Amino acid sequence: LSKVNVSMSKSKSAFFCQNCGHEAPKWLGKCPGCKEWNTLIEERTEKTPKHVVSFSKSSSAQQAVLIQEVQKSEESRIPLQDFELNRVLGGGIVPGSINLLGGDPGIGKSTLLLQMAIKEHLKVLYVSGEESEQQIRMRAERLGLDNPHCYLLTETNLQQVLIQAEQIQPQLLIIDSIQTLYTESVESSPGSVVQVRECTANLLRFAKQTDIPIFLIGHITKDGTIAGPKVLEHMVDSVLQFEGDRHHIYRLLRSIKNRFGSTNELGIYSMQGNGLLPVANPSEVLVSIGSEALSGVAVASMVDGIRPLLIEVQALVSSAAYGTPQRSSTGFDVKRLNMLLAVLEKRCGFRLAAKDVFLNIAGGIKVDDPAIDLAVAMAILSSNADLAID
């Protein structure tokens, strides 16, 4: 009975913010950390002895050294055959790094990393908590299985995953997804704030001690942010965002955070039946080339990060069939569209108040660069006058 009491005394209940991970001893309507309302949920945690986390490969106590005396690492980046992912990561995968990939459901996150696992000539351990081994094998064959050293593991227990990783010693570890993992040291369900934080901390420690790079797939919330505590993005070395419209074939890979490279790089993929194909010249596929010039179409040049792109702006202007004119935009901010229409009406004298205006950015990409405002205005005026732009 005394042992039971001791065991139960080691567990406690606390409230954690789902947005930023702030811990509070009781429920609060407003989070003191991020100032958001109704984001605190109750989690049961287990009190474990707190140890100092060291990323050194030796267990002895560390002494402070001069920065000039620190030996440089001789290990270089691991280059990838996927030149778009290679570009976004800054030239390849850094050994011992931990990378987080987020994106909408069904956008292609698992496909991108599974493709990397089966096509790169590396020893890879692919851990999935969402699919069976048979399902992954079927997808791998469709994508073109070309790696005899790709290991599959369907497991959600983090301790078992780390044991397998220590035995196999892969050159790359992929976790699909971090929200499905759980550690036995925390008494809460997988995907909770505490579980995501503790699992990521253990994986981070493992990566730094073994120099095995890790890729994590993270789910996102309704507002587009990665699910889990905000501290998750601070713990990892890079945060990659995979975005695009599921009804279009093109996908964009952006680097939101990168400790080992630039965050201005952009990768573009085309979703085909045999997987995600890198697009070397995106301007060639984002702009339609036809023999007949059409009204309401304008081509603009823009820079996304440090990558120049040519994009096609398509506009349709017609008389309002109903009382209130409609304003619709795909890939472009509708508030900015309304502002441009007001400028054309007020300063340029074009009567557009009684017109329906529909705007689309070809290719399904989202653009927020103000450099295309002129192209948007010209496409609208071209459609209104039914005159093609030469």
Task: Map each language-model feature to its residues.
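P-loop (Walker A) phosphate-binding loop of NTP-binding proteins
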Residues: 104, 129
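Peripheral, non-AAA+ core regions of ATP-driven protein-machinery
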Residues: 9-12, 16-19, 23-89, 94-100, ...
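Conserved Rossmann-like nucleotide-cofactor binding loop
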Residues: 132
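Conserved RecA-like ASCE P-loop NTPase motor core of nucleic-acid helicases/translocases
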Residues: 124-128
